[in-house]
Amino acid sequence: VKLDLALRELHRSETSLGRRFRRVGERHQADHDVFHLCADLAGWSDDHVRRITEAGTSHGVRLADSPPRIGQVMSSVRKMASVALGRRPEPGLLLLADLRSVYLHAAAVSVDWELLAQGAQAARDTDLLELATQCHPETLRQMEWANTMLKELAPQVLTS
């Protein structure tokens, strides 16, 4: 059974998604809704990573326990850049690009959850199937948020 490969890839992609949400939030701190929602959505990915790590341990797969955190220096730099960008006309285009990236990455994570679920079902691994059943809907909600934001912002940004 190659479920260990699915767990490793899912761990990597969820870790990356959480990091991506944090970067977008920090880059767009001037938009408080985006900043706070990105922090919340990154937290969902952090929880998924923790649960994937626990599942990996019970399946003999060693995975890094916690997603890497961005250092204080980089956080300060991004905050200053966010304030500076907030005064320029291009932050809308940057936000669209960031949301597009988040959406596409969340879609890839969604596929990883689906692969794990299908593999777990075929292997009759109820623990992994339950994990996928519980976490995958949150990934779909992360995608939905990014898609909704794209739909709301695109007309204004692309026609101004």
Language-model region placement:
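Inter-helical turn/loop segments and adjacent helix faces that build the functional surface
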Residues: 24-34, 59-60, 117-133, 152-157
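Short terminal or interdomain "cap/linker" segment that borders an active site or interface and mediates
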Residues: 139-160
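Conserved alpha-helical segments that form or flank metal/cofactor-binding pockets of metalloenzymes
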Residues: 32-80, 146-149
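Charge-rich, acidic-biased intrinsically disordered regions
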Residues: 62-80, 126-137, 156-160
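Short alpha-helical functional segments enriched in proximate histidine and acidic residues
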Residues: 24, 48, 142
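Acidic/histidine-rich alpha-helical segments that form the ligand environment
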Residues: 3-26, 73-123
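Alpha-helical scaffold segments that form or flank carboxylate-/histidine-based iron centers
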Residues: 2-10, 31-51, 98-105, 127-139
